[in-house]
């Protein structure tokens, strides 16, 4: 429409992902974001089911299958780091060890009173983790086990989207988000 190109992305926690949905996603979606907060203990702490059981063991095999079905392209494993996993480079390495090639991990956005909220005093540790991650990526690349980390691929000359930084989310400024309820 009017020389516009629309790209469709879906984000999933993987719980309801099955072969039929995977087929639809691979046919209709340009990109897929797979929400996995980190290593098993981190993910299960942040994403338990109502019965208290963690979701990691259910979703990881589904995510691996989907990533392979897309030839390790046009998807991202998207993690979230919190005060509970400021050592998030270990989560990225865990994703790589699971066979994923496209990764992202972002800081949690929450009220400062939340126990998992990142605090100003955590910033030096976070900066250290990004440096550590860069070194680990170089080593993995030398070993023939390279992977992409989304935030190291951003055009630094273009700068971050101001609206996204102000709202902590690109929804409504860069993209349209639709909840399960429409």
Which functions belong to the PLM regions below?
Residues 41-57, 64, 68-181:
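Radical SAM enzyme [4Fe-4S]-AdoMet core and its adjacent flexible, acidic
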Residues 1-42, 49-61, 79-90:
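Canonical radical SAM enzyme core domain
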């Amino acid at each position: 429409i009017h020389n516009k190109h629309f790209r469709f992305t879906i984000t999933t926690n993987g719980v309801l992902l099955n072969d039929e949905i995977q087929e639809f996603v691979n046919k209709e979606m340009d990109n897929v974001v797979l929400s996995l907060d980190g290593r098993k203990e981190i993910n299960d702490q942040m994403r338990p089911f109502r019965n208290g059981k963690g979701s990691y063991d259910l979703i990881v095999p589904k995510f691996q299958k989907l990533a392979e079905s897309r030839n390790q392209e046009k998807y991202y494993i998207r993690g979230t780091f919190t005060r509970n996993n400021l050592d998030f480079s270990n989560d990225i390495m865990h994703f790589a060890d699971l066979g994923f090639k496209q990764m992202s991990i972002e800081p949690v956005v929450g009220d400062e009173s939340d126990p998992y909220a990142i605090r100003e005093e955590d910033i030096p540790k976070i900066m250290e983790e990004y440096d550590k991650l860069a070194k680990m990526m170089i080593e993995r690349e030398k070993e023939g086990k390279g992977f992409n980390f989304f935030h190291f691929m951003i055009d630094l000359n273009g700068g971050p989207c101001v609206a996204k930084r102000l709202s902590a989310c690109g929804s409504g400024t860069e993209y349209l988000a639709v909840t399960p309820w429409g």
